[in-house]
């Protein structure tokens, strides 16, 4: 039986019993001063929703995620859906429903969204869902979401995204050592690799303060576009020459620029750049 329906049944039995008991007491008490019990006492919004056929909170969570993933919903309404979603998962029961509803994977995938506000809200929702919730904290490890959050916290170009990523990391690691160890392994250069006790709040706070103060170093790379998918030709110097059709600026951090040079993969999507990769030329790689 639906838990809300079961609660509704218990409430109705209790209310009927109390009403009968109250009636008997009134018959035995001629003063008639006993106030009737409030019939709505004990009813929850979820029970009323079940009674009147409204959508359950699980239904609302699924509907919000559908809106977030839909190409037909504009950014403004996506952010409204995200705000509603975040409020729903403030309840630990709803946060624990993310897994059976199949919502964890799409939520984590939204950390890669092209819109900064979508990345910000995804990190915010993750931080809310995992707070004081070991089951949800473990799910971030299973989904390999912690390295992504560290990357957002230290390298995203938008400050509010970095801020919410730190919030998510803070919620994920407190009192949960496996998550703390995973974050420690994912920290960029300049951070200690020494083990941090997830139960030591002073040590955790010190790491979070350092992440909040982190200032990414950015470099502008020029990615040359090809006129056609034909193979590049060779110049007299032996260097590959790619037919060009303008350039586009891609603002990335130093580590990501070096990764692009080494792997030939797009810094944002991770897809292979093919011959374009040979034309990536960082104007500056600061040390």
Swiss-Prot record:
It comes from the Eukaryota. Keywords: Cytoplasm, Repeat, Translation regulation. Residues 16-46 are annotated as: Disordered. Residues 18-34 have a biased composition (Low complexity). It holds the Pfam family Fes1. ARM repeats lie at residues 32-73, 92-131, 134-174, 192-231. InterPro entries: ARM-like, ARM-type_fold, Hsp70_NEF-Inhibitors, Nucleotide_exch_fac_Fes1. GO terms for biological process: regulation of translation. Its main location: cytoplasm. GO terms for molecular function: adenyl-nucleotide exchange factor activity. One of its GO terms (cellular component) is endoplasmic reticulum. It is found in: Cytoplasm. Disulfide bonds: none annotated. The keyword Zinc-finger does not apply. Functions as a nucleotide exchange factor (NEF) for Hsp70 chaperones which accelerates the release of ADP. Required for fully efficient Hsp70-mediated folding of proteins. Belongs to the FES1 family. This is Hsp70 nucleotide exchange factor fes1. It comes from Aspergillus niger (strain ATCC MYA-4892 / CBS 513.88 / FGSC A1513). The gene is fes1.
């Amino acid at each position: 039986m639906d838990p809300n329906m079961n609660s509704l049944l218990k409430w109705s039995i209790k209310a009927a019993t109390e009403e009968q008991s109250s009636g008997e007491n009134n018959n035995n008490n001629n003063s008639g001063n006993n106030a009737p019990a409030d019939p709505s006492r004990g009813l929850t919004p979820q029970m009323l929703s079940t009674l009147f056929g409204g959508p359950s909170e699980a239904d609302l969570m699924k509907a919000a995620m559908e809106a977030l993933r839909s190409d037909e919903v504009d950014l403004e309404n996506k952010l409204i859906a995200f705000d509603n979603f975040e409020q729903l998962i403030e309840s630990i029961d709803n946060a624990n429903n993310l897994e059976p509803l199949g919502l964890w994977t799409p939520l984590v995938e939204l950390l890669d969204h092209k819109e900064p506000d979508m990345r910000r809200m995804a990190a915010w929702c993750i931080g809310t869902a995992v707070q004081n919730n070991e089951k949800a904290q473990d799910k971030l490890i299973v989904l390999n979401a912690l390295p992504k959050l560290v990357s957002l916290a230290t390298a995203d170009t938008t400050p509010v995204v970095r801020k919410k990523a730190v919030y998510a990391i803070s919620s994920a690691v407190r009192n949960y050592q496996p998550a703390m160890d995973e974050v420690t392994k994912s920290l960029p250069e300049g951070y200690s690799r020494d083990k941090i006790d997830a139960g030591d709040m002073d040590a955790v706070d010190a790491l979070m303060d350092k992440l909040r103060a982190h200032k990414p170093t950015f470099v502008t790379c020029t990615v040359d576009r090809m006129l056609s998918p034909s193979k590049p030709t060779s110049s007299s110097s032996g260097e590959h020459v790619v037919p060009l059709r303008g350039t586009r600026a891609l603002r990335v951090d130093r580590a990501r620029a070096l990764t692009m040079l080494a792997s030939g993969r797009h810094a944002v999507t991770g897809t292979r750049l093919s011959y374009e990769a040979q034309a990536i030329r960082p104007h500056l790689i600061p040390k």
